[in-house]
Amino acid sequence: MACAAVMIPGLLRCSVGAIRIEAASLRLTLSTLRHLTLTSIMKSKRKTDHMERTASVLRREIVSAAKVCGAASESPSVKSLRLLVADQDFSFKAGQWVDFFIPGVSVVGGFSICSSPRLLEQERVIELAVKYTNHPPALWVHNTCTLDCEVAVRVGGEFFFDPQPADASRNLVLIAGGVGINPLLSILRHAADLLREQANKRNGYEIGTIKLFYSAKNTSELLFKKNILDLVNEFPEKIACSLHVTKQTTQINAELKPYITEGRITEKEIRDHISKETLFYICGPPPMTDFFSKQLENNHVPKEHICFEKWW
């Protein structure tokens, strides 16, 4: 995953009280981190290596150890992880990713966080969803990782949604392809937290409407369907979604059918949501992000209103 920005069923739960980790033991030394990073870059001959692609992208200085406290299959090809990060200095903005350091694996992974910042604040937990590939970090997640495995994480990325209370209200259009849903789900969940906060306290950031366009090969590969529809039903006047499948071969179940469109997300669907109050966040394969960012520019959407992240 590289960043370019122009501005569970059966999931095992955990709590800080259930797994105690001393904060002092969660830090990697700077020399150790430098060794891990340089080793990864030198040993990887892939042009798509996460550390190489994101070398110029801003990162936080804090590197925190984390313990796997939950895992589940989100689809036939995607496994989700819950990580307990007890370090109180560890934080992130909705949409950002982590460098993922695995003991014994020289290659550093790069995975977007799909949970909201609020979950970290309340439970010291972040969630990731990792697609199966031959990349060593992904192979480790799918074939080796078990409960209580220890890793280290560092936050990075310039693709995020982090409004402040006094900021102007904005609508959001989120455009996701495949596992590109991960950072956009984090943003969607953060938006829902802001809506709840506003409803309960009558203050804080006043967010506009949120529309999610999400495309995958078939309904089995549409990740987090229940989470997304739960938010749509919780905030029917604020959150809407359009789920697209491009190679569906089985019957679509009745619960999903009202939200499903067979075929790709179209330019017209996106164009209908253009306004001066709308921010666009796009995450998916490079051809998809290139297409929609270009179409938005052609329709005179300011570049500062278009944020995108590419997945390889």
From Swiss-Prot:
Disulfide bonds, paired cysteine numbers: none
Signal listed as a keyword: yes
Secretion signal, residue range per the UniProt entry: 1-17
GO MF annotations, alphabetized: oxidoreductase activity
Domain FAD-binding FR-type: 50-186
One Gene Ontology term, aspect cellular component: mitochondrion
CDD domains, per database record: FNR_like
Domain of life of the source: Eukaryota
InterPro entries per the UniProt record, alphabetical: FAD-bd_FR_type (IPR017927), FNR_nucleotide-bd (IPR039261), Oxidoreductase_NAD-binding (IPR052128), OxRdtase_FAD/NAD-bd (IPR001433), Riboflavin_synthase-like_b-brl (IPR017938)
Residues bound to NAD(+): 178-183
EC number assigned by the record: 1.-.-.-
Keywords: NAD, Oxidoreductase, Signal
Protein name per its UniProtKB record: Oxidoreductase NAD-binding domain-containing protein 1
Species of the source: Homo sapiens (Human)
